[in-house]
C-alpha cells in the first residue's frame, strides 16, 4: 500500500498555512521525495519522516519553489548516518545542477549518489 504525505502544496510564495511543493511517497520500506521546496526538512520533521527513509528524490523541474530546499536537505543527509545509495531523478542538466549545489554550499558530500536525467515524455 502506498502512503502519500503532502509536505507542501503552495506555489512560489509560501503562506502561513502552506509550504512550497513537496510530496513524500512511502511504499513498504521505500521512500520517494517528489520535489523539495523551501521548508521541506521542517515539514518532514512535523510529519515524523526520518531522512533515512528517503531512497529517491524526483525533481519535476528546476524552479525554485520545487528545489530551494534541496541544498539543505542534501547537506543534512550527508551529515547524518545515511546509508545506501540516494537516487536523484530529474530533467536534463540535473547532474550539473546537483554538482553546482555541492560547490556553492561548500560541504563535504558523504552521500553515495546515483543521478539519472530523465528524458521528456
Model-derived segments and spans:
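Binuclear metal-dependent hydrolase catalytic cores
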Residues: 1-121
Amino acid at each position: 500500500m502506498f502512503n502519500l504525505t503532502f509536505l507542501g502544496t503552495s506555489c512560489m510564495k509560501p503562506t502561513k498555512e502552506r509550504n512550497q511543493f513537496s510530496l513524500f511517497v512511502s511504499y513498504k520500506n521505500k521512500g520517494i521525495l517528489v520535489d523539495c521546496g523551501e521548508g521541506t526538512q521542517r515539514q518532514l520533521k512535523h510529519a515524523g519522516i526520518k531522512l533515512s527513509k528517503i531512497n529517491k528524490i524526483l525533481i519535476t523541474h528546476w524552479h525554485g519553489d520545487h528545489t530551494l530546499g534541496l541544498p539543505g536537505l542534501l547537506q543534512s543527509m550527508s551529515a547524518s548516518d545515511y546509508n545506501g545509495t540516494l537516487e536523484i531523478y530529474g530533467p536534463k542538466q540535473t547532474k550539473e545542477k546537483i554538482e553546482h549545489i555541492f560547490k556553492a554550499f561548500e560541504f563535504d558530500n558523504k552521500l553515495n549518489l546515483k543521478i539519472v536525467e530523465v528524458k521528456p515524455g
